[in-house]
């Protein structure tokens, strides 16, 4: 009788099954690793870059340079928070699937979407990139080569992670819909 009750609750989504549980856990781990990679990569760049070094590389407007660096710092803060949340979730036993799904949802909106549509409009998403094989982001002004070398590979990684999270949402989890029709 007890097994039938548990099976009914599992079917209603009140108790996660082992397969779904492991999918959420793996996605949380992959997302945390991705965010840590982003933080390390961007921090390495920011630790070696100054406003003067960017302008020496390519004479561009000081305000735009400041906005780009500010956007990178903001992105790093969000990604660091997301990586920390994923790490804490993975250490907890039992694994809290509902909290993990909410964390993945927040990562999507605070990190992934912020990368493609930064608050300060320092660059924008090239929506045709997936069809043309080009860069996923376009700058509003010419930028130094070092900045392109940082962001263009990151854009491919962000595209992949966005697809992973959208695929995860579409694979039957109870996570809130990521993309609104």
Task: Give each language-model segment a name.
Residues 1-181:
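Long, low-complexity or tandemly repetitive, helically biased scaffold regions used
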């Amino acid at each position: 009788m007890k097994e039938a009750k548990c099976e009914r609750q599992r079917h209603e989504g009140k108790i996660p099954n082992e397969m779904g549980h492991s999918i959420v856990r793996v996605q949380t781990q992959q997302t945390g690793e991705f965010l840590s990679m982003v933080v390390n990569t961007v921090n390495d760049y920011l630790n070696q870059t100054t406003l003067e070094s960017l302008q020496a590389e390519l004479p561009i407007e000081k305000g735009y340079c400041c906005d780009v660096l500010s956007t990178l710092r903001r992105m790093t803060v969000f990604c660091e928070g997301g990586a920390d949340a994923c790490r804490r979730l993975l250490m907890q036993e039992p694994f809290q699937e509902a909290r993990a799904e909410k964390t993945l949802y927040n990562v999507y909106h605070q990190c992934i979407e912020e990368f493609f549509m930064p608050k300060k409009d320092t660059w924008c998403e090239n929506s045709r990139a997936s069809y043309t094989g080009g860069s996923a982001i376009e700058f509003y002004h010419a930028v130094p080569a070092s900045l392109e070398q940082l962001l263009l590979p990151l854009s491919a990684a962000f595209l992949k992670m966005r697809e992973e999270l959208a695929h995860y949402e579409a694979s039957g989890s109870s996570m809130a819909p990521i993309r609104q029709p």
